[in-house]
């Protein structure tokens, strides 16, 4: 599985337009791409858990781009552009392990690329 650090490095190029300590809105596309990178990495690392969650919550849908990114082990960051910020938030916060696993990983990944967020 792809490590979080490699995902963070992959999206660093997109976030490169941000300075070392840039503060951005949570809905900024650069923030969303880092979040989605962590999310895709987490799905890859815990695929069975996501399948079980999907089976238990069939109305929780994901954009096709996320599924393609999960199974495409190349550079997927360009696939994830254009996903609406509210949809990113819904997907990421909608899983039971958001607080315990995703939120800390997202905070770490954002920090590594020098992005800090403010509420919209």
Curated annotation (Swiss-Prot):
Organism of origin: Saccharomyces cerevisiae (strain ATCC 204508 / S288c) (Baker's yeast)
PANTHER family xrefs: CELL WALL PROTEIN CWP1-RELATED (PTHR31002:SF34), SERIPAUPERIN (PTHR31002)
Similarity field: Belongs to the SRP1/TIP1 family. Seripauperin subfamily.
GO molecular function: structural constituent of cell wall
Region forming the signal peptide: 1-20
Superkingdom: Eukaryota
Name the record gives this protein: Seripauperin-10
PROSITE patterns attached to this UniProt entry: SRP1_TIP1 (PS00724)
Taxonomic classification: Eukaryota, Fungi, Dikarya, Ascomycota, Saccharomycotina
Pfam families cross-referenced by the UniProt entry: SRP1_TIP1
InterPro entries with a match to the protein in the record: SRP1_TIP1, Yeast_SRP1/TIP1_CWP
Keyword hit for Signal: yes
Entry keyword Signal: yes
One Gene Ontology cellular component: fungal-type vacuole
Keyword annotations: Signal
One GO biological process term: fungal-type cell wall organization
